[in-house]
Amino acid sequence: MKRAAQIAPIPTLALLPCALLTGFDAFDGASLNPSWLAVKAIDGELLVGHRIRVAQLPTAFDASLKELKHLLRLHKPTLVICVGQAGGRSALSLERVAININDASIADNAGAQPLDTPVVQGGPAAYFSTLPIKAMLIALLRAGMAAEVSQSAGTFVCNHVFYGLMHELSKKSIAADKKPARGGFVHVPFLPEQGAPSMHLNDMVAGLRLAVQTALLTV
């Protein structure tokens, strides 16, 4: 009698590796932040064998990195993409470099406005993204999406979080499989109701989804 073929068990979502995306809350008197609306739309999805987890960071220098460090310990992601809003831009901006400086032109949501202070005292002058930003750019452009590689993430909370993320990832492996986690930052434009230039939310969501897929597929 032939033995029945054994079917490999399907791993539960809890056992799958995690990709973490973060967005920010609204700031500077605004009622919304498209970065949060965009990442929230793909929470819980399964992409390239990874479960997508998302979280909102406060637009505050001190609290944002405290929350991010907690999320890294909690989820142990293999991929981290932090997302922020960049008014005045018309494309998804794949950030190349984070610099070790805080120089805020406005106060954050906690009332802090650091000027010419380091993100990490004694840290390197800069960290490069470890995301495959050129592969992500090509994929986005081929899909007909507005995208670019950006050479500056600014000097507000977005750059602060970007630098802090890369500093944490440089110290040790935080991923559940003990392999080095990759990370970086993406800026999204305004939504149409916020002003011009802008991008529709559906396009942001599709672009971020494709960016995550490309990052996970690119060695």
Residue ranges and their predicted role:
Residues K2-A153, M166-K171, K178-P180, S198-G207, ...:
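N-terminal catalytic or cofactor-binding beta/alpha core of small enzyme domains
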